[in-house]
Regions:
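Cytosolic-side ends of inner-membrane transmembrane helices, especially those
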Residues: 19-30, 151, 155, 159-175
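A short beta-strand signature within small-molecule sensing/ligand-binding domains used
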Residues: 112-124, 130
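Juxtamembrane segments flanking the first transmembrane helix
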Residues: 1-74, 143
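Short amphipathic alpha-helical/adjacent loop interface patches that line ligand
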Residues: 42, 138, 182-185
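Helix-start (N-cap) segments at beta->loop->alpha junctions
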Residues: 126-127, 134-154
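Membrane-proximal alpha-helical signal-transduction linkers
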Residues: 173-191
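Extracytoplasmic ligand-binding sensor domains of the Cache superfamily
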Residues: 47-48, 56-113
C-alpha cells in the first residue's frame, strides 16, 4: 500500500508538471505566431494611411472586412498627432493604448467579455508619429486550452489508475510463490 501511495504521488506530480509545462510552451509558441499576424495587421494599417487634402486619412477600402463587423474579434485603433481612427468592430468599446510598444504580456478585457491579445506598434508615416494598436480575441484559444487541460487531466488519471492496477497485479503475481510457501509452512506446523 505504501508503494502504491508513493507511486501515485510521484506520477501525479511529474504528470502535472509535464502537462503544464507542455501547455505553457505551446501557448508561448502560439502567442509568438499570433504576434507575427498582429504585426502584419499593424503594418497593413500603416500602409492604408494616405496623405489627403485634409491631412492623413485612413483608406478603409484596404482593410480586412473583420474590422467592419461588430465584435468580430479583430480590432484596431490608430492614433496620429491630431486624430484617432478606430475599427467599427469595437462599437462603443474603448481600446486603450498600452504603455509600451510590442505584444502586451497580459490579456485585455474587450467588448462582450472577450479577452484580447494586444500589440502596439509605434511608426512614422509621412513624417508624423503614429501609434497603431491591434487586438485579436484570445477567448476561443483560452477555452481550447482549458478543454485540453481537462482532457489531459482525465487521461492522466486514467493512466494513473491503469499503472496502479498493473502494479498491484505485478506485486500479487510476484508474491504468489511466497503465499504458497506460507501455506506450506502453515500445513507443516499444523501437522
Amino acid at each position: 500500500r505504501r508503494l502504491s501511495l508513493g507511486l501515485i504521488g510521484v506520477l501525479l506530480v511529474v504528470g502535472l508538471l509535464l502537462a503544464q509545462t507542455s501547455l505553457w510552451l505551446f501557448e508561448l509558441g502560439l502567442r509568438s505566431y499570433l504576434e507575427v499576424g498582429l504585426r502584419n495587421e499593424a503594418e497593413s494599417l500603416l500602409v492604408s494611411i494616405e496623405r489627403g487634402s485634409k491631412g492623413l486619412q485612413l483608406d478603409s477600402q484596404r482593410l480586412i472586412p473583420s474590422y467592419s463587423r461588430l465584435f468580430s474579434g479583430y480590432y484596431y485603433r490608430v492614433e496620429a498627432v491630431d486624430q484617432v481612427w478606430r475599427s467599427r468592430s469595437l462599437w462603443d468599446h474603448e481600446l486603450v493604448k498600452p504603455d509600451y510598444p510590442g505584444l502586451q504580456a497580459d490579456l485585455v478585457q474587450g467588448p462582450k467579455h472577450q479577452q484580447l491579445l494586444v500589440l502596439r506598434g509605434d511608426y512614422r508615416r509621412f513624417g508624423q508619429p503614429l501609434s497603431i494598436i491591434v487586438a485579436e480575441d484570445y477567448s476561443p484559444l483560452l477555452s481550447s486550452f482549458r478543454r485540453v487541460q481537462y482532457i489531459g487531466l482525465g487521461l492522466g488519471l486514467a493512466a494513473l489508475l491503469l499503472v496502479l492496477f498493473l502494479q498491484r497485479l505485478t506485486v500479487r503475481n510476484a508474491l504468489r510463490p511466497l503465499d504458497q510457501a506460507r501455506q506450506q509452512i502453515a500445513q507443516l506446523q499444523g501437522g
